[in-house]
Amino acid sequence: MQNNNDILKAQSPAALAEEYIVKSIWQDVFPAGSNLPSERDLADKIGVTRTTLREVLQRLARDGWLTIQHGKPTKVNNIWDAAGPNIIETLIALDMQSAPLIIDNMLSLRSKMSESYIYEAVKNSPQKSTALFAELEQLQNTAQDYTEFDYQLFRQFTVVANKPFYRLIFNSLKGVYQRIGLLFFKEKTHRELTKQFYLEMQQICLEGNADAVVDCIRKHNLRSSTYWKAILERLPQNLSD
């Protein structure tokens, strides 16, 4: 776990404390399994109040970075065992070298999940599935609009399919989903390719042809895979800013 950028960028005291602790954990200054320094020592070192530090520690504990032990020192967790997908955006900020792999994993997960729950959605309620494309004709040809439409479309299919767990996964990935979506959809060719996918999927929903869902998704993923490969090979260093 390494990061060449040791300069803290946070502005507020709480953000500064969080960035310092998270970077220190990632760089093994505070290794997994070790204990953090006392609140007093850590607050003095960072330059924040103990109240601010305590709030930050509680938030990091909820995210899986730490385990707060009442009456005992706060323990540093192994994030790969204790954290959830909501920290992905933080991991990308900490280690841009690992970002392509993490994002590729996320895209693969989305593809596999969507094959399952979109099939269920179209099978159980083709009318509600079709309604998700109501705004497609008015979709503006911009990266921002395509990114938002894409996120909402895939997320709302989880609602129609009655898959609340998948919906929570989308919620936790929203930040990084939007960042990489803007990278993908800034190219007109990518928007045109995706628009064709939307139209094909809309027709499938209109016909209630659930059996065609998986093939449609896989064909789109295959068509777009070359574009994604190029994007992941030249990710901007300021992706997390």
Swiss-Prot record:
Organism (species): Haemophilus influenzae (strain PittEE)
Function comment: Multifunctional regulator of fatty acid metabolism.
Oligomer status and interactors: Homodimer.
Disulfide-bonded cysteines: none
DNA-binding region, residues: 39-58
Principal location listed in the UniProt entry: cytoplasm
Domain of life (superkingdom): Bacteria
Keywords assigned: Activator, Cytoplasm, DNA-binding, Fatty acid metabolism, Lipid metabolism, Repressor, Transcription, Transcription regulation
Entries under Pfam families matching the protein: FadR_C (PF07840), GntR (PF00392)
Gene: fadR
SUPFAM superfamilies: GntR ligand-binding domain-like, Winged helix' DNA-binding domain
Protein name as annotated: Fatty acid metabolism regulator protein
InterPro entries named among the record's database cross-references: FA-response_TF_FadR, FadR_C, TF_FadR/GntR_C, Tscrpt_reg_HTH_GntR, WH-like_DNA-bd_sf, WH_DNA-bd_sf
Locations listed in the record: Cytoplasm
HTH gntR-type domain mapped to chain residues: 11-79
GO annotation (BP), single: regulation of fatty acid metabolic process
CDD domains: WHTH_GntR
